[in-house]
Amino acid sequence: MNPNQKIITIGSICMVIGIVSLMLQIGNIISIWVSHSIQTGNQHQAEPCNQSIITYENNTWVNQTYVNISNTNLLTEKAVASVTLAGNSSLCPISGWAVYSKDNGIRIGSKGDVFVIREPFISCSHLECRTFFLTQGALLNDKHSNGTVKDRSPYRTLMSCPVGEAPSPYNSRFESVAWSASACHDGTSWLTIGISGPDNGAVAVLKYNGIITDTIKSWRNNILRTQESECACVNGSCFTVMTDGPSNGQASYKIFKIEKGKVVKSVELNAPNYHYEECSCYPDAGEITCVCRDNWHGSNRPWVSFNQNLEYQIGYICSGVFGDNPRPNDGTGSCGPVSPNGAYGIKGFSFKYGNGVWIGRTKSTNSRSGFEMIWDPNGWTGTDSNFSVKQDIVAITDWSGYSGSFVQHPELTGVDCIRPCFWVELIRGRPKESTIWTSGSSISFCGVNSDTVGWSWPDGAELPFTIDK
């Protein structure tokens, strides 16, 4: 091969190699562009890890859950049809109470990011139960927890998390700005009621599916306040009770009927010498029963029951097994307010079964400690103090606090009756303990017609925390 042929051969080989290399580079560029386009499309739809998004489309809930696995966002989607929580069934027959949840929020909060809260309560849809709570805009064991014994501040918000979980920034959902609140589900969406503002002019903001739908202005300009537990829904309408006026004298009380977040009717109770605060309400056979707190002059609990047209009856639980705190020792009851130790009070609940009543109360007669459930077979109408069942929930040596009712509808449980349940707040910190903060955890129980056990399920946190020393 002469020199010219060698040059031509080498040139040809180089040209072939160059063309192959160019084709490989073009293929690589195309591959990168296609891969980038696919990733960009997925990222446009995805949200951060473990975040749930609910989209409402033509009366169908689309429940979307995003799970982050090795930096790849996978979207799973399940359509869930909405229902109407009828509330027409009767309360389930029960013989005792089975423990349902315990969040251990204070114990976990000594080392983890847990909200400073008070007034927790539970409410259930046809799909899930959630714990609602009023935060103080602060975390446990942090400087902003100082002074959180205060009830009403602009930093308080209503938030919620899955039942049984400690309330933290990582699992909680903002609901409303509020220092007094209620929430419930009608089978289609969550209704939240959050009261905030000055004592002499607070406003309740109603939200339905997270959107503001109505407001209620304080009508007596004296600390408008509501239940601190779930509202009650029947046949697509939800009902709540609000108070406006003195905490130690005659106040004004209204029942509100709400549909899809808008007030459609209200009635003011004609209730002289009655005092209603922080009512615990539940549906039973298509009507609503609320058992409340008398902070004026009763150591037994007032009640109001009403139908869907807001036609109501009022009274006091007659039993000599008194349900408020402070209270006298059990004795002879009254179907009106029992005056001894009647001033002040604590949020509580009871469940009516015919002439009988399940009474939840603190074990102590003068401090917020201990908790027990008592069945008085004649206590709704009879004034004696005889009872047939007592179930221990929290020992008298451990702190308790507010308590309230919630229910699980047949659409959730699959049984043909409404299951009665209750929660107990376990308050820790100020004013009884040497801390700079006040907060609480919670436990809950549901009624069953099978074996149960009495025990003590206390908060269990060891105080003080590092921030308190």
UniProtKB/Swiss-Prot annotation:
Residues 91-469 are annotated as: Head of neuraminidase. Residues 11-33 are annotated as: Involved in apical transport and lipid raft association. One of its GO terms (biological process) is carbohydrate metabolic process. It is found in: Virion membrane; Host apical cell membrane. The keyword Glycoprotein applies. One of its GO terms (molecular function) is exo-alpha-sialidase activity. Glycans are attached at residues 50, 58, 63, 68, 88, 146, 235, 386. Homotetramer. Catalyzes the removal of terminal sialic acid residues from viral and cellular glycoconjugates. Cleaves off the terminal sialic acids on the glycosylated HA during virus budding to facilitate virus release. Additionally helps virus spread through the circulation by further removing sialic acids from the cell surface. These cleavages prevent self-aggregation and ensure the efficient spread of the progeny virus from cell to cell. Otherwise, infection would be limited to one round of replication. Belongs to the glycosyl hydrolase 34 family. This is Neuraminidase. It comes from Influenza A virus (strain A/Chicken/Hong Kong/FY150/2001 H5N1 genotype D).
